[in-house]
Amino acid sequence: MITTNIIIKHRIAVLCLVALVFQVSMRAQQFAVGNNLVYSAALTPNLSLETRLDSSWTLGIAGGFRPWPTDDTAQRKYRHFSIDLYGRKWTEGTPWRGWFYGYDALWVHYNLSNLKMRYFGMFGDARHHRIQGNVIGVGSFGGYAWDLGSGFGIDVQGGADLAWTHYRMYDCVHCGSPVARKNRVYLLPKVSVDVSWRF
């Protein structure tokens, strides 16, 4: 009698699980995997994963990692790792189509040296020193998404993040003790062109 009850409970649990999986697969697209082409053009492999919360909100996480040059003694470095958490509100009531706006929280760890660029006032110290540190920021953005069919889409967006960075400055490309520590606040622009696949 006890084993029969256990078998019945197991069958009910399996049926409920199958029904749940079938229900999720029958609903509209729930997830999107994407790639930011602007970030890729900067030679930073990246990937995003986004999920539908309801008919007008999605929640996502994006990450990028630029490990090269892998040689710690290389003179020029532009290595970084980033994570961006974001939420998007879709104004037409259907995720991944039409106008949207959103909010994000950003974290970046970087290791830079011998760079001749000044990205909106940032990284000026990296021209003659190696700097290593973190950026933390929050911001907002807006954009438009096009449905290309067969689950594929493309969206463009622009916005800004208010970011705080703390970094250590070194005299050589691979040294021990820092010569200075600095904190800065920046307003960073955010531009992306994302290609995504929804499922």
What are these regions (language model features)?
Residues 2-14:
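Bacterial N-terminal signal peptides that target proteins for export
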Residues 15-16, 26:
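Cleavable N-terminal signal peptides
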Residues 22-28:
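Sec/Tat signal peptide C-region and signal peptidase I cleavage site
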Residues 29-42, 58-69:
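Transmembrane beta-strand segments that form the barrel wall of outer-membrane beta-barrel proteins
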Residues 43-46, 139:
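Short, surface-exposed coil-to-beta transition loops
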